From Swiss-Prot:
This is Histone H3. One of its GO terms (cellular component) is nucleus. Phosphorylated to form H3S10ph. H3S10ph promotes subsequent H3K14ac formation and is required for transcriptional activation through TBP recruitment to the promoters. Mono-, di- and trimethylated by the COMPASS complex to form H3K4me1/2/3. H3K4me activates gene expression by regulating transcription elongation and plays a role in telomere length maintenance. H3K4me enrichment correlates with transcription levels, and occurs in a 5' to 3' gradient with H3K4me3 enrichment at the 5'-end of genes, shifting to H3K4me2 and then H3K4me1. Methylated by SET2 to form H3K36me. H3K36me represses gene expression. Methylated by DOT1 to form H3K79me. H3K79me is required for association of SIR proteins with telomeric regions and for telomeric silencing. The keyword Secreted does not apply. The nucleosome is a histone octamer containing two molecules each of H2A, H2B, H3 and H4 assembled in one H3-H4 heterotetramer and two H2A-H2B heterodimers. The octamer wraps approximately 147 bp of DNA. The modification N6-methyllysine is found at K5, K10, K19, K24, K28, K37, K80. The keyword Acetylation applies. The modification N6,N6-dimethyllysine is found at K5, K15, K28, K37, K80. GO terms for molecular function: DNA binding; protein heterodimerization activity; structural constituent of chromatin. Transmembrane segments: none annotated.
């Protein structure tokens, strides 16, 4: 464990004023007004881990079909206008895109872990793509 420098601190000395103690006791004994219960919150990371397990078990497509279809058609227009797609072709494209993204994020996570981090950053994606031999 790293050592830390000790610094002198002024001691306040004496006891706390009586007013503070009296107000604390009054707050404890007084009934709570409103009765509004705070919503339950999980610890940070708990929900994320639950979602990771859920999505690793599932096999359904995670990108919505219509937005993906619009994106494919928009990109295809740059190459040739009035292209038509079979629905199975768009489905196959979406399957391959999602498989590619999942494997890219797996490699990206390994790059972040190698750098002793738990948060992925853009430089991890760049390194993963560079190691795969992808450019552009």
């Amino acid at each position: 464990m790293a050592r830390t420098k000790q610094t002198a601190r002024k001691s306040t000395g004496g006891k706390a004023p009586r007013k503070q103690l009296a107000s604390k006791a009054a707050r404890k004994s007084a009934p709570s007004t409103g009765g509004v219960k705070k919503p339950h919150r999980y610890k940070p990371g708990t929900v994320a881990l639950r979602e990771i397990r859920r999505y690793q078990k599932s096999t359904e497509l995670l990108i919505r079909k219509l937005p993906f279809q619009r994106l494919v058609r928009e990109i295809a227009q740059d190459f040739k206008s009035d292209l038509r797609f079979q629905s199975s072709a768009i489905g196959a494209l979406q399957e391959s895109v999602e498989a590619y993204l999942v494997s890219l994020f797996e490699d990206t996570n390994l790059c972040a872990i190698h750098a002793k981090r738990v948060t992925i950053q853009s430089k991890d994606i760049q390194l993963a793509r560079r190691l795969r031999g992808e450019r552009g």
